[in-house]
Amino acid sequence: MQAYGKRQPKANVSSDSTAVADNEMSVMLKNITVTASRGVARKTPIAMSDVDRREVENKLGNNELPEMLNQTPGVYATKNSGAYGDSKLNMRGFQSSNVAVMVNGVPVNDMEHGGLYWSNWGGLGEMVRYMQTQRGLGASKVSVPSIGGTVNIVTKTTDSKRGGYATYSVGNDGFNHVSASFSTGLTKSGWNFSMLFGKKWGDGYIQGTDFTDYDYFFAVSKRLGQHHQIALTGFGSPQSHYQRNQYDGLSVEGWQDVKRFMGGKSVYRYNPTYGFGKNGERKSSAFNFYHKPQFSLNHIWLIDDKSSLNTALYMSIGHGYGNSGQGINSAYANSWYGAANGKLRYDFRHADGTFAYDQVQELNEQSDAGSKMVMAQSFNDHIWYGLLSTYTRQLAKGLDFYAGFDVRSYKGTHTAKISDLYNGAYYTDLRYRSSVNPANNAAALDPNWQYEKLSVGDVVFRDYDSHIVQHGVF
């Protein structure tokens, strides 16, 4: 509760409510605004846990946000391949595709496969007000398949106090983090504005997994009379990072095999696809760039002292790619991987253990039929917008009624484009073009299309759109 004046009388505020002052002469609140649904630990009849802001501040450091939930019963978070933003989150044994993840009550799971890429939310840790998990089927106010559970991440928004800060921190493996934040607090005219900007960069714990991440966040809200409030929130984390491919895992024997490459360092830091080209330039078959900003406009209507209506209109625009090694046949395509069946691959391998990208370049230079192996950027762009509205009514003490609807529309564009011919003259994508159905692409009617000589920027491997419309009630 916030109050103005010297007197601050007591007021009963429900656990999922945030109280704000009506005007500067107020000595107590007349209205209560619901900004996010939140259960009460040990009082709500669901298996739930909270992680508050203080705990996040104490433990985050250069860890990733899902790792803050590792002390939560039924939750298991891991760095997965070890690169920046590549964390995985399981709940009750279920993968993220069966765990509903929301930011301020807005769903963020991928619309196509249900998974989640935590690298898209690299800067979210600084914005967190609290995180709440519900294990198993619970009371989430969104129509999603969440048999594993629900994670709701609530950011600092309309409750931010006046002030700001600037920080710079360092950590192991070249980790650097600089950020600045400012908030006006609630003004006399009912406005509240908050913003945050930051940057993270470092070498990564795993060999050759350096990263750069920019973070931004803003929230602006306005009280409209006695019973209405609107809030506009936006955040994003454009990032790029080298990876250790999740399919390059080694067996116990395989890890011992690479011990000779690490010079006394932990064998588990070894990266099978770390390497350089002929001129000493950095090359990688495992690199990711992505930017997925999300914006939401919320309207909150306090109908009376027992009921409210919360409506959110949101939009997310995603753009980015991951490297995708291509080859004229499966043998060459698989050679881009650093391991197979738990064992290190030696197709293209130097004596020091680095991946021999220079040998790929030499292979293509010696070919009279164009490149045998090329690198492509596999784009996954999308535009996603939705509307989520929830009506809440307190029927009796300890008994609430919820009803609402959830509508979403999504278009994804999936294209792979050649980014590096690796010193070859051209590339032919006969491997995939030969199987294209003319009903899907009229160009396949031309027999010469399969043998087209392709260069940097040309499409290979895949080129399709996906359209999804989802609606539900609860």
What are the residue ranges of the model-derived segments?
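Extracytoplasmic beta-strand/coil segments of soluble accessory domains associated
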Residues: 66-107, 123, 129
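Outer-membrane beta-barrel transmembrane strands
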Residues: 279-324, 371-406, 413-414, 458-474
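N-terminal periplasmic "start-of-domain" segments of outer-membrane beta-barrel proteins
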Residues: 14-15, 26-60, 88, 96
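Structural signature of outer-membrane beta-barrel domains
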Residues: 39, 96, 108, 156, ...
